[in-house]
């Protein structure tokens, strides 16, 4: 999970550019389901196994229905959300009746549907296995898992003699368990233990090759996902999550899209639907396009199904089939465009801007900042103390620094329908609220009001159309580029990449919705423990 909630209208959108894959290239059909979880009304109170099964079967009934619907639409793999079978907020003792032991598929080959009596107390595994087997589909689900340990052998073994894990389980299309992943980066999950060592879990399908597995809060950390992508060459990922949205930088679909685009991967992201907790936002993302769903008003689930290109390098033929595979975190154009080396970071001078559309205002700025050089100020964004400068006028060239880390922005407003304040912010430091991780962030944000103190607050809507070129002096190669439009409209940079002197940049022109956020979100993983 991450952070806190907000409200926005229903959004189920296909975001697409020109796809670089030929029609005769290998493809497959994937599905994700955003599930409204039937919750335990008192998760801190222990229950009998029969009551736990009765509760979980209510959610599994929905899984069974949605798996059949996905299969009818040709889906070969389906992903369900984190916590979607059992719910949230258990204690270590109150979750006991919900636990099952998921065997290691590297040691045990087992289809719970075909051999239901091999292991006891595995009713949930049996139902999931039969869903996969009946519908001839790979199925990814998340469930609580118990693994017995011996404190005489394992010094990290908990006092009660068992690990309790937040676990993703993958079933093949014949119901066999083919992968098991224990979530590494827990988010206020008192019922669960982190695994004693990092797990790098993959599984192989006959239709698309290899997939990697990770869960929710893992997406903000190096292990395991960056290792899966950069060191192991995984380009397709399944991602159960129970993510609480927080703007302006970490709404679920916003960061899912940024991660897929910047890491150069396919991401199958299934989130929980829970309005009271601000949970929504699922999607099927590739580096070039996305089918996603965001609904902060209704309470119904949502099935997404999409045909995708195979991105596993190990199953693609040499030559044209691999030519468009992306190097993770290298940046790339949205469509295939020939670019000379000298043009990769074009100066784009203000004097070259085309005439602006007429409008009621030349672009709002605080009265004290309507000068040639805007005055830096500080404001809290995502619990961090950002240094910002306000945008003024219709076009300009700004720089803002937090210590030696600097962000630069060249902008022009094509339309300003009403008074809206924008600011460019920089942050270089250790984030310590709801997790500890080191950030270098450049963010162009629409402020929630007309006062500087409102810059960094949560808003989903904007009317101002902004063309921009942004770059920052990052010390890390792990920079996630993202653009978010009004009404939770996902956008993407026209191009992004590394310029001279360690500067990472992105450019976007011609947006048709107002700009809410444009962000270069740098993660300095090696500084997390400072």
Protein language model regions, located:
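Bacterial N-terminal signal peptides that target proteins for export
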Residues: 1-7
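Active-site-proximal beta-strand elements of phosphoester/diester hydrolases
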Residues: 27-52, 180-183, 202, 209-218, ...
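N-terminal signal peptide
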Residues: 10-28
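C-terminal beta-strand edge segments of enzyme domains
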Residues: 271-530
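Conserved beta-strand scaffold positions in the cores of enzyme catalytic domains, especially
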Residues: 30-32, 267-269, 282
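Cys-nucleophile CN-hydrolase/nitrilase-fold catalytic domain and related Cys-dependent amidase chemistry
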Residues: 52-174, 243-266, 272-275, 428-431, ...
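Active-site catalytic loop in hydrolytic enzyme cores
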Residues: 117-119, 125-137, 143-236, 240-257, ...
């Amino acid at each position: 999970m991450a952070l806190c909630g907000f409200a926005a209208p229903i959004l189920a959108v296909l975001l697409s550019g020109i796809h670089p894959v030929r029609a005769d290239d290998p493809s497959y059909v994937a599905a994700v389901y955003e599930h409204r979880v039937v919750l335990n009304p008192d998760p801190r109170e222990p229950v009998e196994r029969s009551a736990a099964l009765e509760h979980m079967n209510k959610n599994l009934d929905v899984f069974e229905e949605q798996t059949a619907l996905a299969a009818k639409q040709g889906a070969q793999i389906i992903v369900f959300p984190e916590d979607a079978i059992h719910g949230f907020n258990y204690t270590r003792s109150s979750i006991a009746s919900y636990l099952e032991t998921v065997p290691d598929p590297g040691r045990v080959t087992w289809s719970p549907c075909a051999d239901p009596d091999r292991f006891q107390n595995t009713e949930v595994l049996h139902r999931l296995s039969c869903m996969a087997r009946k519908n001839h589909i790979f199925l990814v689900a998340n469930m609580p898992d118990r693994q017995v340990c011996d404190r005489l052998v394992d010094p990290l073994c908990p006092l009660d003699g068992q690990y309790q894990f937040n676990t993703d389980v993958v079933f093949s299309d014949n119901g066999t368990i083919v992968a098991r992943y224990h979530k590494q980066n827990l988010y206020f999950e008192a019922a669960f233990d982190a695994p004693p060592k990092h797990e790098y879990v993959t599984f192989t399908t006959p239709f698309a090759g290899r997939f990697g597995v990770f869960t929710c809060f893992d997406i903000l950390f190096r292990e395991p996902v960056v290792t899966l992508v950069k060191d192991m060459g995984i380009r397709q990922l399944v991602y159960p999550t129970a993510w609480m949205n927080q703007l302006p930088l970490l709404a679920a679909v916003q960061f899912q899209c940024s991660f897929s685009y910047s890491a150069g991967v396919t991401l199958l992201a299934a989130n929980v639907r829970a309005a009271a907790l601000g949970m929504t936002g699922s999607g099927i993302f590739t580096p070039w396009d996305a089918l996603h769903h965001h609904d902060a008003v209704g309470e119904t689930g949502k099935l997404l199904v999409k045909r995708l290109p195979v991105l596993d390098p190990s199953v693609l033929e040499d030559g044209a089939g691999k030519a468009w595979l992306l190097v993770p975190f290298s940046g790339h154009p949205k469509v295939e465009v020939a670019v000379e080396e000298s043009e990769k970071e074009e100066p784009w001078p203000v004097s070259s801007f085309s005439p602006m559309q007429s409008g009621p205002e030349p672009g709002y700025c605080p009265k004290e900042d309507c000068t040639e050089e805007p005055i830096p100020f500080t404001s809290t964004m995502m619990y961090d103390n950002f240094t910002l400068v306000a945008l003024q006028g219709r076009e300009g060239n700004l720089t803002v620094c937090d210590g030696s880390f600097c962000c630069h922005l060249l902008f022009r407003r094509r339309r300003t329908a009403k008074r809206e304040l924008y600011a460019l912010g920089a942050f270089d430091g250790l984030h310590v609220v709801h997790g500890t991780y080191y950030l270098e962030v450049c963010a162009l944000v629409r402020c929630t009001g007309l006062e500087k103190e409102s810059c960094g607050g949560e808003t989903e809507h904007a009317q101002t159309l902004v063309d921009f070129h942004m770059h920052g002096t990052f010390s890390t190669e792990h920079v996630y580029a993202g653009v978010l439009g009004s009404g939770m409209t996902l956008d993407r940079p026209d191009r992004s990449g590394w310029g001279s002197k360690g500067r990472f940049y992105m450019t976007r022109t011609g947006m048709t919705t107002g700009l809410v956020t444009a962000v270069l979100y740098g993660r300095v993983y090696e500084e997390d423990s400072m």
